Each structure stands twice: as C-alpha cells, then as structure tokens.
C-alpha cells in the first residue's frame, strides 16, 4: 500500500476496490469527513458526495448497477465529489495524527481595542496508528522518493508529504490535484492545489504547491525566494 500511494498505482487500488464492500467504503469516507461540509465561516459552503447503495439504487435503479463501480470509487473517480477544502482537512488529519482543526477565514475579531481569537475546535478522524503510519509514509514517498509522482513539490532542507491526483473530465481536459503538508516530522503547513482542465497533478499542480511551500519557509526563516 505504501508503494501504491507513492507511485500512484491505479491497478493496485483497482484490486483493493474489488475486495471492498461499497457500504464499508461509504462508512469510512463518512467517518473521516470527506462528504461533509467543513463548517468554515463562509455561507453556502458546498458539500461533497460519496455514494452508497441507497444512492445508486435511487439514481440508477435496483439491479441496474454492478460492483464494477468500486473500480472507479477506489481511485476517487466516478460519482465521488470532494471540495479542495474538505480534502485539505483530511490531509491535515493525517498530518496531525488523526484530528484536524475546523477551518476559519477570520483568526480574531477586534472591538474597542480588544481582540478575541477564535477558540480552535478539533474534529477527530478515527484511524489506527498503523493506518496513519502507512498513509504518512506513502505520502512522504510521493515527494521524496525518486519514483514518487510529486517530486516537483520538493523543498530543499525540508521533507514534504503529498499526493498527486488527476481527475478525468468527460467535458474536457483532466483536472490536476495536489495536496501536501510539511515538514514531514513536525507539520506546520498544508496545501491543496486544484487546477481545472490543466492536466496531470504531478506535472502541473505539484510544482505550484512546492512554490507555495518555499515561500512559506523562506518567510518563516527570513529568506527570499526567486519568482519562477
């Protein structure tokens, strides 16, 4: 599984999908918050979609779909919908060891010279230490291993963990995804890049994420980064 994540091997995940039950897939996705809204302080936030048996029966009819749909779902395609923010929260949960903070646009509110900061609210992502370790190691390999699909997000002096994604689009060119966090051992920052109709995640989105990380660490460390 670690190598499957690192090299983004669809065939490996197809085989996992064949062995999975749709309801288990749905339950774990829901448990980890992927189809839910993040509750960021912006009105009309869109939710995601992870289909289950009831959804397929309603939209395709009972007996009109097969277990073959698991091949698409196993690589996050087909009917699966996630927002960049919900995916970023999921990645933060992996980086933090199984929990993430509810995102906010506003850090603090001032009134008459006083400032009141938002109290962080954390969401648990129930996940075993073994599962977390596998995901973290696989994502580190995506960026740091020579065979990784996200090498373009490397940052000199820091280890980065990430995951590339390429969403097929029936109406045009593929959508390019990349999510990451850094430093690997003591995470401080997480990034999600989505470029619609732009191509492959490793080739297009990962370099942008790497540039964002380089700016972040340069500013933190008092240095500068040249424009690409």
Predicted features by range, described:
Residues 199-200:
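Short beta-strands and strand-coil junctions in structured, solvent-facing domains, enriched
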Residues 83-89, 204-211:
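Short amphipathic alpha-helical face segments that pack within enzyme cores
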Residues 114-123, 208-228:
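Short, gly/Ser/Thr-rich active-site loops of penicillin-recognizing serine hydrolases
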Residues 1-193:
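Beta-lactam-recognizing serine transpeptidase/beta-lactamase-like catalytic domain environment
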């Amino acid at each position: 599984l670690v190598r499957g994540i690192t090299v983004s091997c669809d065939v490996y995940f197809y085989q996992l999908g064949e062995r999975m039950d749709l309801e288990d897939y749905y339950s774990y996705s829901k448990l980890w918050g992927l189809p839910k809204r993040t509750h960021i302080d912006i009105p009309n936030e869109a939710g995601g979609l992870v289909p289950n048996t009831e959804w397929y029966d309603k939209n395709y009819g009972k007996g009109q779909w097969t277990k073959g749909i698991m091949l698409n779902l196993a690589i996050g395609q087909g009917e699966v919908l996630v927002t960049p923010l919900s995916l970023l929260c999921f990645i933060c949960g992996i980086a933090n060891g199984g929990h993430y903070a509810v995102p906010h646009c506003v850090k603090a509110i001032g009134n008459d010279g006083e400032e009141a900061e938002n109290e962080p609210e954390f969401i648990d992502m129930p996940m075993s230490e073994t599962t977390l370790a596998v995901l973290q190691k696989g994502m580190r390999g995506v960026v740091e291993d020579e065979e990784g699909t996200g090498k373009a997000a490397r940052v000199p002096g820091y280890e980065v963990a990430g995951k590339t994604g390429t969403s097929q689009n029936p109406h045009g060119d593929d959508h390019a995804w990349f999510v990451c966090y850094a430093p690997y051992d003591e995470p401080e920052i997480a990034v999600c890049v989505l470029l619609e109709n732009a191509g492959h995640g490793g080739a297009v989105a990962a370099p942008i994420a790497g540039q964002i990380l380089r700016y972040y660490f340069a500013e933190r460390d008092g240095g500068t980064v040249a424009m690409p």
